Amino acid sequence: MPTIIVTTRDGEELSLEADTGLSLMEVIRDGGADELLALCGGCCSCATCHVKVDPAFLAALPPMSEDESDLLDSSDHRDATSRLSCQITVDDGLAGLRVAIAPED
């Protein structure tokens, strides 16, 4: 069960034990970070689960789909570390992953 470190918008750091196979979005919401809205429920159609991934982990993530990229284009806060947490499936290779919840658009 990998541990994921999440920084909330107010700077609080949460250490979350993650079940493999869940999306990062599910782990963050189940861990109590209510500010991650995920309005579409993880269907890659809203971009309200936007996170910034620690650059050290970017190569460990699956490639970004065109749909994910298009949705992130709508954010004023997109940068090279931006991902939608609903599109990242947690596995043991992500142990220690650090993400920050992106500012709300």
Swiss-Prot record:
Concerning Pfam families, the annotation shows: Fer2
Residues that bind [2Fe-2S] cluster: C40, C46, C49, C86
Q: Does the keyword Metal-binding apply?
A: yes
Note how many cofactor molecules are bound and how: Binds 1 [2Fe-2S] cluster.
Keywords, sorted A to Z: 2Fe-2S, Electron transport, Iron, Iron-sulfur, Metal-binding, Transport
Q: Which cofactors does this gene product need? A: [2Fe-2S] cluster
Domain 2Fe-2S ferredoxin-type as annotated: residue spans: 2-105
Record-linked Gene3D superfamilies: 3.10.20.30
Q: Which SUPFAM superfamilies match?
A: 2Fe-2S ferredoxin-like
Give the Gene Ontology MF terms in alphabetical order.
Answer: 2 iron, 2 sulfur cluster binding; electron transfer activity; metal ion binding
What does the record list as GO biological process? P450-containing electron transport chain
Q: Which CDD domains match?
A: fer2
As for family, the record states:
Belongs to the adrenodoxin/putidaredoxin family.
Q: What does this protein do?
A: Component of the chloroacetanilide N-alkylformylase multicomponent enzyme system involved in the degradation of chloroacetanilide herbicides (N-alkoxyalkyl-N-chloroacetyl-substituted aniline derivatives). In vitro, functions as an intermediate electron transfer protein.
Q: How does it assemble?
A: The chloroacetanilide N-alkylformylase multicomponent enzyme system is composed of an oxygenase component (CndA) and an electron transfer component formed by a ferredoxin reductase (CndC1) and a ferredoxin (CndB1). In vitro, chloroacetanilide N-alkylformylase assays in which CndB1 is substituted for CndB2 demonstrate that the two enzymes possess nearly identical activities.
Q: What is this protein called?
A: Chloroacetanilide N-alkylformylase 1, ferredoxin component
Q: What is the lineage of its organism?
A: Bacteria, Pseudomonadati, Pseudomonadota, Alphaproteobacteria, Sphingomonadales
Its gene? Answer: cndB1
